[in-house]
Amino acid sequence: QLSITQPAVSQHIKALEQELGVRIFERIDGQLIVTKQGEEVVKCAKKMLGLYNNLRQNLRDSRRLTTHLTIGVTHTAESNPIAEALAKYCAANEGISIKMITDTISNLYTMLNTYELDLAIVEGRIADPNIHYLLLDTDYLVLAVSVNHPFAKRSMVTLNELKKERMILRLPDSNTRNLFVAHLESNNMSISDFNVVLEIDNMATIKDLIRRDFGVSILARSVCLDELKKGKITVLPVENLSMMREINIAYHNDFTQFDVLHDIMKVYNETLRIYA
């Protein structure tokens, strides 16, 4: 894409290394490996590229009287009413265009810091002085079961009862899974005490398998609202596990379109009323 030869690339890298006074790459066993200092260079380069792309997009938007937003969401947020709320926000505001990217929470924060994202919808928050938050909602984890499951008629289940069930869980790097594991550990239990038969990253697949009684799962209640309204699955709390968390809109500290934040929040709350 740059239309330059490999020797020219090597020359540019060498010149940059001399200018910065660091080694960006090291050759180990015939492979080029990025050094620790090189990782910092790459990180800053991504940030500069993100800022440049934002500048170009903002200039185009100002000419066309449009607004383009790139919003990152976790797999949980993708499956709750936030996607519907963003679609309604675009439909109600001519000139607004949103690109929605789904990724892990750690990758979303990285993209937020490198200006690849304007906003991120995340569960919880981290201590980062560059990131600010607006509380969007409060969510909690529940046990999700088929409407034909014996638990469906119960108001609560115990952890010991849950040990006997076939469990379908999110992957180990998911925030939902980690919150469940943390609460198990606070009760002197481990995930290995449970019969985990499937680990899946796709929320829709998990809910479909639950509905067809292939197992039970621990999910955020917000991702089950549509199924609950249609009577497709049942959710209930687990005794001694109060797995609550915040859903936040995260944004960089130099983000200035606060009207967008509050408009999204308003549409989200209006969308929630449909499922009340």
Go through each PLM region and give its residues.
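Central regulatory/effector-binding core of bacterial HTH transcription factors
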Residues: 66-129
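Hydrophobic hinge/microswitch elements
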Residues: 104-117, 122-123, 176, 182-233
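Beta-alpha-beta core module
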Residues: 129-135, 139, 154, 201-253
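Secondary-structure junction motif
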Residues: 167-188, 258, 265, 275
